[in-house]
């Protein structure tokens, strides 16, 4: 993974960053999301200081990330429990089913 410079327009400024080329599109998307969230925050609340709007948006995004991580963790636990239940069911079925031995004769 070689890093290449990418130019992003963010809050009226040009930022030059290095990141792997295959991540350029994702970084552009992230910058666009952050830019729109900060602009929306400033418009909605009347906050004039970019730093304050950035701090609030960063806090909101961090909160959203934590919420998603908690959801993912709960889903993983549910899936793990279902896998364990299915495994027990299959083991029970396997133990109660008589195995048949195939007999072959070569003429």
Curated annotation (Swiss-Prot):
Localization per Swiss-Prot or TrEMBL: Cytoplasm
Alphabetized Gene3D superfamilies for the sequence: Cell division protein ZapA protomer, N-terminal domain
GO biological process, one term: septin ring assembly
Protein name per its UniProtKB record: Cell division protein ZapA
Gene Ontology CC, one term: cytosol
InterPro entries (alphabetical): Cell_div_ZapA-like, Cell_div_ZapA-like_sf, Cell_div_ZapA_N
Protein origin, superkingdom: Bacteria
Keywords tagged on the record: Cell cycle, Cell division, Coiled coil, Cytoplasm, Septation
Coiled coil: 21-42, 71-96
Keyword Cytoplasm recorded: yes
Protein function: Activator of cell division through the inhibition of FtsZ GTPase activity, therefore promoting FtsZ assembly into bundles of protofilaments necessary for the formation of the division Z ring. It is recruited early at mid-cell but it is not essential for cell division.
Organism placement in taxonomy: Bacteria, Pseudomonadati, Pseudomonadota, Gammaproteobacteria, Pasteurellales
Family: Belongs to the ZapA family. Type 1 subfamily.
Quaternary context: Homodimer. Interacts with FtsZ.
């Amino acid at each position: 993974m070689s890093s290449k410079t990418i130019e992003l327009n963010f809050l009226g400024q040009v930022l030059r960053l290095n990141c792997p080329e295959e991540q350029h599109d994702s970084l552009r998307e992230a910058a666009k999301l952050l830019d729109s969230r900060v602009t929306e925050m400033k418009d909605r609340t009347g906050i004039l200081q970019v730093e304050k709007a950035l701090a609030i948006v960063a806090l909101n995004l961090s909160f959203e990330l934590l919420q998603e991580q908690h959801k993912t963790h709960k889903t993983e636990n549910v899936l793990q429990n279902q896998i364990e239940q299915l495994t027990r069911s299959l083991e029970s079925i396997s133990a109660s089913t008589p195995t048949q031995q195939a007999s072959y004769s070569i003429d």
